[in-house]
């Protein structure tokens, strides 16, 4: 069974995204929720939205009596053609999901990722046959992509995501139906998202707090027990790989303006406000980090930088 969903529970808090449920072998189920990081409510927690999704009457019966086997989270690139970066640099190419070749309108990306890798391989063979010693920026990789079927496929889907963000699920859905099914993505204009994700949060004065129900330990769970299933490990003596440009900013700026959203957008409980009597302290539990990189994207003050930790550290997912 394959289930794709949109709307609830994210729509209740004016957020967008989608959900999936796939039946696997050995009576296993893969379930997940994709949350667009342009949401505006600082009290929203993607992790807790996933827990809510599991309570849907169409989903809960599938999970009845099941055992939670694994958990993970990752920031994904789904902006499509509008968000593709320069895909070549000296000595390397960006391919697949590292570049962002997902066809969002079809919710498919394996074939486009493979094609981008094949084009990169063809480019490498070309330059090796030409006697290239390496280390150059081979920008004609981009030309190869534009001459393949990959570029027109991504171009035909370029308006899908921006239409949903600009017009909402109903008008945006109608727009996309006409664009994708009648016009085959050949509209003479391109919609774009002009607001970066970290600038999308409303301040607390203009936001409604969200009271998530406590997990029942059967169908819904807490972050800590979920992170345990990621088999995450970092050496205790290694430097913290989550850097703050200003250590005072979380309490002085983010807390009063946005209720410090790092406590909620992080799916692993890395960031927390610790109360110590009358004082408060911003704590980074770097050992919990599952390397999703959401903090580097969503922090409204752009105060957090995720850097590569020591080799071997991080999650070790099973069955994912």
Tell where the protein language model's regions lie, with residue ranges.
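Conserved FAD/dinucleotide-binding core of flavoprotein oxidoreductases
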Residues: 3-5, 11-75, 111, 130, ...
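Short, glycine-/Ser/Thr-/acidic-enriched flexible segments
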Residues: 26-27, 36-38, 99-101, 109, ...
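FAD-binding beta-loop-beta segment adjacent to the flavin cofactor pocket
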Residues: 73-104, 225-241, 249-265, 272
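Active-site-proximal substrate-binding core of FAD-dependent oxidoreductases
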Residues: 100-106, 112, 118, 122-169, ...
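Mid-to-C-terminal Rossmann-like scaffold of FAD/NAD(P)H-dependent oxidoreductases
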Residues: 134-242, 248-250
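Iron-sulfur cluster-binding cysteine motifs and their immediate structural context
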Residues: 256-287, 293-318
């Amino acid at each position: 069974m394959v289930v794709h969903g949109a709307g609830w529970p994210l729509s209740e808090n004016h957020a967008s995204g989608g959900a999936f449920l796939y039946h696997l072998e050995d009576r296993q189920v893969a379930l997940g929720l994709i949350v667009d990081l342009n949401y505006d409510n600082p009290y929203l927690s993607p992790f807790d939205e996933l827990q809510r999704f599991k309570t849907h009457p169409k989903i809960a019966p599938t999970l009845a009596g099941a055992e939670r086997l694994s958990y993970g989270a990752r920031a994904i690139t789904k902006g499509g053609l509008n968000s593709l970066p320069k895909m070549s640099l000296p000595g390397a190419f960006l391919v697949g999901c590292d570049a962002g070749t997902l066809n969002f309108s079809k919710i498919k990306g394996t074939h486009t990722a493979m094609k981008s890798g094949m084009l990169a391989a063809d480019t490498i063979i070309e330059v090796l046959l030409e006697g290239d010693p390496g280390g150059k920026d081979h920008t004609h990789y981009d030309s190869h992509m534009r001459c393949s079927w990959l570029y027109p496929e991504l171009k035909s889907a370029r308006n899908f995501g921006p239409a949903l963000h600009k017009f909402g699920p109903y008008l945006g859905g109608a727009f996309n139906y006409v664009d994708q099914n009648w016009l085959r993505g050949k509209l003479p204009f391109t919609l774009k998202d002009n607001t970066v994700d970290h600038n999308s949060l409303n301040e607390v004065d203009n936001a409604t707090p969200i009271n998530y129900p406590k997990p029942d330990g059967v169908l819904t769970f807490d972050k800590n027990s979920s992170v345990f299933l990621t088999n995450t490990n970092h050496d205790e003596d290694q430097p913290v790989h989550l850097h703050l440009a200003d250590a005072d900013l979380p309490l002085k700026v983010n807390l009063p303006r946005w209720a410090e959203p790092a406590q909620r957008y992080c799916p692993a409980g890395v960031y927390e406000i610790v109360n110590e009597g009358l004082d408060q302290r911003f704590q980074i539990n770097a050992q919990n980090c599952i390397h999703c990189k959401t903090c580097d994207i969503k922090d409204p003050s752009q105060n957090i930088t995720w850097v590569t930790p020591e080799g071997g550290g991080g999650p070790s997912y099973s069955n994912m």
